């Protein structure tokens, strides 16, 4: 894996060019490599995840995390799909201003224009990261426990409790299309204006007819009486 330049889950995600049917983000801030660097997950998990990613569909995905994971994503996850003219050559990390809880502070733009924002609570601050023309998808994420066969450092096989990060299918889609919205607003305004003009014209004609009728009636009354 190292020879391919893939030493953590983020590199793997960038390498395989995630699309709308393969949406995964794993963050384990307590997992380090031999040099003390945070790597997210080890090679053994990464190889398994790499295979699973290629086979998963949009119906939902399940991530098996190491048993010593102390913190895992839980709540909601946003996928922000940038248009082709916003593509970046390398991942970009943005820290949200005013965040002191450490929740919702990571936003990544992958090299294919797909971004992810993860947080434990739904936060409206994500809107500051979305530009006109972006497509935003919302996924529900939960953490579950299950029994799995594992291998320890000595090579011994045992059945231990593992944490599973479950990513649901797409539960909500938000289209940020200001151009389309503006066109729609202008179109509705034109319809309203035409309706107002027609209504005003008809109303004016009706008023004129009423005035003429009243004047004729008064004239007839003065003649015959």
Swiss-Prot record:
It is a single-pass membrane protein. It comes from the Bacteria. It is found in: Cell membrane. The chain crosses the membrane at residues 181-203. SUPFAM superfamilies: Anthrax protective antigen. Pfam families: PA_Ig-like. Gene3D superfamilies: 2.60.40.810. GO terms for cellular component: plasma membrane. InterPro entries: PA_dom_4 (IPR027441), PA_Ig-like (IPR048853). Keywords: Cell membrane, Membrane, Plasmid, Transmembrane, Transmembrane helix. This is Uncharacterized protein pXO1-111/BXA0163/GBAA_pXO1_0163.
């Amino acid at each position: 894996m190292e020879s391919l330049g893939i030493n953590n889950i983020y590199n793997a995600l960038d390498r395989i060019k995630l699309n709308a049917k393969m949406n995964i983000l794993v963050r384990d801030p307590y997992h380090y490599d031999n040099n003390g660097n945070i790597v997210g997950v080890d090679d053994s998990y990464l190889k398994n995840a790499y295979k699973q990613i290629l086979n998963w569909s949009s119906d939902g995905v399940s991530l098996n995390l190491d048993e010593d994971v102390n913190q895992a994503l839980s709540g909601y996850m946003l996928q922000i799909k940038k248009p082709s003219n916003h593509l970046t050559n390398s991942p970009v990390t943005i820290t949200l201003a005013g965040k002191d809880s450490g929740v919702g502070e990571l936003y990544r733009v992958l090299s294919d224009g797909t971004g992810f924002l993860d947080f434990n609570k739904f936060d409206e601050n994500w809107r500051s990261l979305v530009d006109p023309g972006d497509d935003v998808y919302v996924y529900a994420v939960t953490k579950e426990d299950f029994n799995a066969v594992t291998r320890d450092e000595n090579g011994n096989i045992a059945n231990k409790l593992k944490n599973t990060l479950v990513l649901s299918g797409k539960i909500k889609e938000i289209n940020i299309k200001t151009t389309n919205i503006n066109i729609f607003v202008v179109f509705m305004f034109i319809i309203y204006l035409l309706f107002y003009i027609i209504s005003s014209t008809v109303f004016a004609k009706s008023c004129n007819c009423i005035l003429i009728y009243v004047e004729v009636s008064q004239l007839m009354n003065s003649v015959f009486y």
